[in-house]
Swiss-Prot record:
It is found in: Cell junction, Adherens junction; Cell membrane; Cytoplasm, Cytoskeleton; Cell junction, Focal adhesion. Changing T195A: In a breast cancer sample; somatic mutation. PROSITE patterns: SH3, SOHO. It comes from Homo sapiens (Human). O-glycosylated. Residues 74-89, 944-954 have a biased composition (Low complexity). Residues 240-252 have a biased composition (Pro residues). This is Sorbin and SH3 domain-containing protein 1. Plays a role in tyrosine phosphorylation of CBL by linking CBL to the insulin receptor. Required for insulin-stimulated glucose transport. Involved in formation of actin stress fibers and focal adhesions. The keyword Disulfide bond does not apply. Pfam families: SH3_1, SH3_2, SH3_9, Sorb. The modification Phosphoserine is found at residues 86, 89, 242, 259, 341, 350, 369, 374, 465, 472, 481, 556, 609, 640, 665, 713, 945, 953. Residues 114-128, 266-275, 437-450, 955-971, 1106-1117, 1162-1172, 1211-1230 have a biased composition (Polar residues).
Length: 1292
């Protein structure tokens, strides 16, 4: 290969200073530098010999390189060296002579490529291009194109003709020390005879010749090393050239195109020497790496054959470009070259990557040889020439070239190149006013590598193309004035700033970083990517990158979504008369982009402090106006910057609900729609408020007749005298906020209620007062309902249409015709209300609302047909809270008329007119009334009205003193059964097996009950001989048919013989009365003490302790009875048991051992040792079985009651009370409600839930409306909630 040709072409082709690439041609001998006055493109399709070239007359044929079209480079005589100063080195001359058979053109092309690889910043072009994967391709031109060159005289400018299809040799070859594989003769420069070489050496001027040494970064001695990678001998030219011109010449884009394989033939034919100055200057100022060959080692674009459209395109532009070049001035051309070169630069890569890719390219080039000569042919502006074989790749490359974006630092005008030249602060900014031509189409100068934009390869190629115009960036053709402005500021701005670190900063030296590269590979680079829009839609002054980087605040997702919503765009055009803002970051506080742009600019220019001062002054004016309204209406004191009284006195001014203002026709700068107003409007719109009727843009139009501060307020006209003061405005705004807050609280409350309703069973804690827990209704129950309940206006009356039987304690039982007062509606199905002083919930379908005008009168029911009146004795004083309640004093005898519900009786006091209802717990029921068609009430033995006030009864007087674990401590005290103990869980009960601490002097309305029959008449108590063989109690002739139930943990007790009976002193005796709810109470009267068997006082403690031990031992010996509900056992009877033929009475054995010992006092057990006639078995306990129930009822009605004596009151009424509650219909009995057996196992999901296993017996205390039950497991003694569909009622 001809090293001469290579050396010369290298110097000129890329237009870069080889010294910047570390090549020291210029440094070696600055005299070698010469100026190229013109670049001529000679489109010769086929150049067989030198004679076929159309050459200028002044061209030196010895300086000609021919090819498929040639570029003639004329060395200007102004910078031309003497012929003697440019002799070829003997080495190079010998090389030419010794290699006649080798293709001179590839060597020339390679040398040019080496020159192009030199970077003005010192970046090694080979490494940069190698990092991009570009492969230089060699045109496969016949070697017979060699020309006989004759040396021209030294006086005429040197003309260097280079083929249009000079292609950079493989970068990989640069990395190797051997010359590239011969690719066939290209005929660039024929083997030049020694004489020709001596006379006029072919060592062409390199760009180092035109670059001052102080601008060449890389050590000049490194050029031979780099050049020697492929053409070591060729790359070194003797130091025979003239010194470089003082002007720092940017390399011409045109020459760079000539030097680039991908820009093959892209050399613009220019005749002016200023173009060369521009060329060299721009190449100094830009990285030559911007022009790599298209192909990468791993590129998806394989080589394509060279096609003639390139030549056609060159011919098309040659004349225009020649004229433009001749008209351009050197400095402006240089600056434009800088501008245009930066965008087309490809990303530099780290030296390591460059070396690897060069090695790859080298190996690939060795293999592919000639087929890679034109990997992707490029036309003059960098567009790859289409090839039928690679049409898809061609389309891809074309699309990316068309849609490239200009890369700029966001802070500056997007039309300024982002690459900075700190070394060139002295570059003047002169505009090219003399370029009248703007091409109608623009193409990028180079084809970026396929990965340059897609896969975030190391760097992005710059986005400014080398167009023929050399002044317009890639995006759009520019007018002359616009380009002048851009070119004028470009160099200064870039030189004044430092480059930003490249994304691959860790792999590059700082000298290889360009600030037009994305910051870092890990940084989101979407803003650097091309948008899918045509480049012709690009508008000056618009840059998405610029606006994106200018965001000075965080944008909320709502704002960003706002502009993207199609409905918003549509309504924006309707409301504002124009499309919505392009970018959401136009929405800045105090600056609403919806408003007209010119208005926004005006307001932004205002001084905020001035506006504040003016507003304050205006507010004072408004206050004065409102205080002393006069005929003269001040002109918009909040608007005009200098408040003044208008000479005209309009009767009305435009106003909103919150502010009354009058806008001057000239739109004074201090108007109410200042920054603060915009901020309010903006916030209102973003928060979902309505857009003002005339749109936000109407608020700031100078011609607008009015303004409003609140975007949601309806506009109307009001008299000027009624303008609101600032205080009123603030107050109304505050009221609106409070209203909004109230709405939010209500919504929150409803949400909480919904959440609570979803799991109403959680946290159920039975309470004496209100069974509807706060957890269920949330904040609604925080309101004091007592006042509402006292006032009739707050409670709406309703009448029950059907009988409603309560299934849980929180439900309110109703009979048809009852009048209830509704407090509130719980949900769509349930009301909460009050009936006869009791509060509860009931279904709305069971009642009918009464009209407010209608007086709430209960329906006249058919009179209750009382078959037999009952009898009771008052145990406590009772003061009725309502008119329907009857007050009485302790000890009074009450005639029972009927049982209103499970907790209330209706009765009257004989001899008086007092009649009403009263709670069962306040009386000892001696005899139950018999009525026709009695109502079956749920058997809740220890329930009472939850709404009963504390004044009606001595509540909780001894609640904390009911139980003591030491029975012996109170041997002589009179103990009473306390129902409250049944509200605690079984686990607690098991810990309190002792006898009650002292007698309960006053019983309270009980807690929600445990199941029925947990307390029994002590007539039926017996000690098991196994548990206490030494002690027996003489009891009536009763045998137990014991079927254990979920609550029974003890075996039946044997009835001991009567000879074990003891007598008790009359003072320690008490008659035993069972009240309606199963409680055993000791009345104050001792009239029946003579009828009781008596025991020695000293034995009471032992009896209790024996009972406790008996129950405990039985529960331990027979644990299977907890789970079994199917076994019956006959109680062992005492030896002296009377009435052996007495009927066996079935009972519900729901009594736990701890319950009995805990709930029964000594006196109660003794008092149950009645005389035989008082404890006859004919007094049933209320069997759980329908059959026994019928039997009991029959006996009861058969005349037992008629023959009853007063002495029998204590024991005989209990069976009646029990049997009355138990009917053949088992659906509502307490046992059904409160004793359940688990069908499935249940694993708790929350802390308050109860674990169930298949077959577990659970004592249910409450059923929640959501289907969950609350109860205690017999097996685990744990208390909690569980799903109701996991259990089934346990029938005994």
């Amino acid at each position: 290969m001809s090293s001469e040709c290579d050396g010369g072409s290298k110097a000129v082709m890329n237009g870069l200073a080889p010294g910047s690439n570390g090549q020291d041609k210029a440094t070696a001998d600055p005299l070698r530098a010469r100026s190229i006055s013109a670049v001529k493109i000679i489109p010769v399709k086929t150049v067989k010999n030198a004679s076929g070239l159309v050459l200028p007359t002044d061209m030196d044929l010895t300086k000609i390189c021919t090819g498929k079209g040639a570029v003639t480079l004329r060395a200007s005589s102004s910078y031309r060296e003497t012929p003697s100063s440019s002799p070829a080195s003997p080495q190079e001359t010998r090389q030419h002579e010794s290699k006649p058979g080798l293709e001179p053109e590839p060597s020339s092309a390679d040398e040019w490529r080496l020159s192009s690889s030199a970077d003005a910043n010192g970046n090694a072009q080979p490494s940069s291009l190698a990092a991009k994967g570009y492969r230089s391709v060699h045109p496969n031109l016949p070697s017979d194109k060699s020309q006989d060159a004759t040396s021209s005289s030294a006086a005429q400018p040197e003309v260097i003709v280079v083929p249009l299809y000079l292609v950079n040799t493989d970068r990989g070859q640069e990395g190797t020390a051997r010359p590239p594989t011969p690719l066939g003769p290209l005929g660039c420069v024929p083997t030049i005879p020694a004489t020709a070489s001596a006379a006029s050496p072919l060592t062409f001027p390199t760009l180092d010749d035109f670059i001052p040494p102080h601008l060449q970064r890389w050590p000049h001695h490194s050029q031979p090393a780099r050049a020697s990678g492929s053409f070591a001998p060729i790359s070194q030219t003797p130091p025979s050239f003239s010194p470089p011109p003082p002007l720092v010449p940017p390399a011409p884009e045109d020459l760079r195109r000539v030097s680039e394989p991908d820009l093959t033939g892209a050399v613009s034919s220019t005749d002016s020497s200023p173009l060369l100055n521009e060329v060299s200057s721009s190449l100094i100022g830009t990285d030559s790496q911007a022009f790599p060959s298209v192909s990468k080692p791993s590129s998806a674009y394989p080589s394509t054959t060279i096609v003639n459209p390139t030549i056609v395109l060159l011919q098309h532009n040659r004349e225009q470009q020649k004229r433009l070049s001749s008209l351009s001035d050197p400095v402006s051309e240089r600056r434009v070259g800088e501008q245009d070169s930066a965008p087309t630069q490809e990303k530099p890569t780290s030296p390591g990557k460059a070396i690897e890719k060069r090695a790859k390219d080298d190996s690939r080039r060795v293999v592919k040889s000639t087929q890679d000569l034109s990997d992707v042919s490029m036309d003059e502006v960098g567009i790859p020439l289409r090839n039928t074989e690679r049409s898809k790749d061609w389309y891809k490359t074309m699309f990316k070239q068309i849609h490239k974006l200009n890369r700029d630092t966001p802070e500056e005008n997007p039309y300024f190149p982002t690459y900075k030249f700190p070394e060139l602060p002295e570059i003047q900014q002169t505009s090219e006013e003399d370029n009248p031509y703007t091409p109608t189409y623009q193409f990028p100068a180079s084809t970026p590598s396929p990965k340059s934009e897609d896969d975030d390869s190391d760097l992005y190629s710059p986005r400014y193309s080398f167009s023929e115009d050399t002044k317009s960036p890639l995006s759009v053709p520019r007018s002359k004035s616009e380009m002048s402005y851009i070119d004028g500021e470009k160099v200064v701005k870039r030189s004044a700033t430092l480059p930003l670190p490249a994304r691959s900063s860790s792999l590059k030296s700082s000298s290889e970083r360009n600030d037009w590269e994305p910051p870092d590979k890990k940084v989101d680079t979407r803003k650097y990517r091309a948008e899918p829009k045509s480049i012709y839609e690009y508008q000056p002054g618009k840059s998405s990158v610029l606006t994106n980087e200018k965001m000075s605040r965080d944008i909320s997702p709502e704002e960003i979504d706002l502009k993207n919503e199609p409905w918003y765009k549509f309504f924006s055009e309707l409301e504002f008369g124009k499309p919505p803002p392009k970018k959401i970051w136009d929405y800045t506080p105090g600056d609403c982009s919806i408003l007209p742009r010119e208005d926004r600019k005006t307001n932004l220019d205002k001084d905020l402090s001035l506006c504040q001062t003016e507003l304050e002054a205006d507010l004072e004016k408004m206050e004065t106006l409102n205080k002393a309204p006069s005929a003269n209406v001040p002109q918009s004191s909040a608007i005009s910057p200098t408040p003044e009284i208008s000479s005209e006195t309009p009767g009305y001014i435009y106003s909103s609900n919150f502010h009354a203002v009058k806008r001057e026709s000239d739109g004074a700068p201090g108007d109410l729609t200042s920054l603060e107003n915009e901020r309010q409007i903006y916030k209102s719109v973003l928060e979902g408020g309505d857009i003002p009727l005339q749109g936000l843009s109407g608020l700031k139009r100078p011609s607008s007749s009015a303004s409003t501060k609140d975007s949601e307020s309806p506009r109307h006209f009001i008299p000027a005298d009624y303008l609101e003061s600032t205080e009123e405005f603030i107050r109304r705004r505050h009221d609106d906020k409070e209203k909004l807050l109230a709405d939010q609280r209500r919504l929150k409350r409803e949400q909480e209620e919904a959440d609570i309703a979803a799991r109403r069973h959680t946290g159920v804690i039975p309470t004496h007062h209100q069974f509807i827990t706060n957890e269920r209704f949330g904040d609604l129950l925080n309101i004091d309902d007592t006042a509402k309940r006292k006032s009739g206006s707050e409670m709406r009356p309703a009448r029950a249409k059907f009988d409603f039987k309560a299934q849980t304690l929180k439900e309110l039982p109703l009979q048809k015709g009852d009048i209830v007062y509704i407090y509130k509606q719980i949900d769509q199905n349930w009301y909460e209300g009050e009936h006869h002083g009791r509060v509860g919930i009931f279904p709305r379908t069971y009642i009918e609302l009464l009209p407010p005008a209608e007086k709430a009168q209960p329906k006249k029911l058919t009179p209750v047909q009382v078959l037999e009146y009952g009898e009771a004795i008052a145990k406590f004083n009772f003061n009725g809270d309502t008119q329907v309640e009857m007050s009485f004093r302790k000890g009074e005898r009450i005639t029972l008329l009927r049982q209103v519900d499970e907790n209330w009786y209706e009765g009257r006091i004989p001899g008086t007119s007092r009649q009403g209802i009263f709670p069962i717990t306040y009386v000892d029921v001696i005899k139950r009334p018999l009525v026709k068609n009695p109502v079956d009430y749920m058997d809740l033995p220890f329930s009472s009205s939850p709404s009963r006030s504390a004044t009606a009864s001595p509540q909780f007087s001894s609640h904390s003193k009911l139980i003591t674990p030491a029975p012996s401590s109170l041997p002589h005290s009179r103990r009473a059964l306390s129902p409250e103990m049944h509200a605690v869980t079984s686990e607690w009960i098991s810990l309190t097996v002792g006898v009650p601490g002292r007698r309960s002097l006053a019983l309270t309305p009980p807690l929600p009950p445990l199941p029925e029959a947990s307390i029994y008449n002590t007539d039926h108590l017996a000690l098991s001989p196994r548990a206490s063989p030494s002690l027996s109690l003489s009891l009536p002739h009763l045998s137990w048919s014991d079927r254990p139930t979920p609550r029974s943990v003890a075996s039946p007790l044997a009835l001991p013989s009567p000879h074990k009976t003891y007598s008790l002193a009359p003072t320690s005796q008490a008659s035993l009365h069972m009240n309606g709810d199963g409680g055993v109470h000791t009345p104050s009267s001792g009239i029946h003490q003579d009828s009781f068997l008596q025991l020695p006082l000293g034995s009471s403690d032992s009896v209790i302790s024996q009972l406790s031990d008996a129950f405990s031992s039985q529960s331990k010996r027979q644990p299977w009875r907890e789970e079994s509900g199917q076994y019956e056992r006959k109680a062992e009877r005492g030896a002296g048991e009377r009435g052996p033929g007495g009927p066996k009475i079935s009972k519900k054995s729901c009594l736990k051992p701890s319950d009995v010992v805990r709930c029964l006092s000594t006196e109660q057990r003794l008092s149950d040792l009645n005389t035989p006639e008082e404890s006859r078995p004919g007094k049933p306990l209320g069997s759980a079985f329908p059959g026994s129930e019928a039997e009991q009822t029959e006996r009861h009605r058969g005349g037992e009651q008629a023959g009853r004596k007063a002495a029998r009151r204590g024991g005989s009424q209990q069976p009646q009370a029990q049997q009355r509650r138990v009917t053949p219909d088992r659906s509502q009995t307490s046992q059904d409600l409160f004793s359940y057996q688990a069908l499935y196992s249940y694993i708790p999901q929350n802390d308050d839930e109860l674990e169930l296993r298949d077959g577990d017996i659970v004592d249910v205390m409450e059923k929640c409306d959501d289907g969950w039950f609350v109860g205690t497991s017999r097996r685990t003694k744990q208390f909690g909630t569980f799903p109701g569909n996991y259990v089934k009622p346990l029938y005994l």
